[in-house]
């Protein structure tokens, strides 16, 4: 694999990926040189862009892998992944290898997967010791509305700025979010394909 393209639903996911991907990818992968994060303005914008982007990437003179990342929100995770995979397959004329990864419920599930990162960013508002034995941190993907849950604990926060700060603190090898780990595994399998 010579190049990776990450098509993401929204700017906050893009900001997190810009920080954590260098922690996940093997040495030699450099943002905006051989891996790119392409944010969209929501689910419909992402879906509309998939056919165009797959066509453009298939014409590149590089072996390009594509990873599509979207929040689950209230959707059925398997059905959503299947719908996005079908759209990618229909749009994939060359074809380019791809993976579809669904963030279980919302991006904040990934934050709760590494509660120490939240505590570092909000040291006076979030204490790991208070939450470590609760599903909030043990099973972060089971939180239906993690964004609201985080707001109840720490109050209102600037979404993109907070995404960057938490991502800097995240330990990508200790995250308990299953969807985060599926995301990581998808990258690894794509690079090795």
Language-model features, listed with the residues they occupy:
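C-terminal accessory helical subdomains adjacent to catalytic cores in phosphodiester-
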Residues: 1-4, 14-40, 47-65, 69-193
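Helix N-cap/beta->alpha junction signal
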Residues: 9-10
């Amino acid at each position: 694999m010579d190049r990776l393209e990450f098509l993401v639903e929204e700017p906050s996911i893009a900001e997190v990926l810009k920080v954590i991907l260098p922690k996940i990818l093997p040495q030699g992968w450099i943002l905006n040189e051989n891996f790119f994060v392409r944010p969209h303005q929501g689910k419909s914008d992402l879906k509309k862009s998939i056919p165009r982007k797959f066509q453009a990437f298939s014409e590149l003179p590089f072996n390009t892998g594509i990873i599509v990342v979207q929040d689950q929100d209230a959707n059925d995770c398997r059905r959503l992944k299947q719908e996005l995979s079908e759209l990618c397959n229909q749009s994939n004329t060359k074809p380019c290898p791809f993976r579809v990864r669904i963030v279980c419920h919302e991006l904040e599930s990934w934050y709760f997967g590494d509660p120490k990162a939240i505590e570092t960013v909000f040291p006076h508002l979030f204490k790991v010791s208070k939450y470590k034995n609760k599903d909030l941190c043990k099973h972060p993907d089971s939180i239906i509305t993690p964004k609201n849950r985080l707001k109840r604990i720490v109050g209102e926060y600037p979404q993109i700025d907070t995404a960057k700060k938490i991502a800097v603190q995240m330990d990508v090898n200790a995250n308990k979010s299953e969807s985060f780990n599926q995301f990581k595994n998808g990258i690894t399998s794509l690079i090795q394909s």
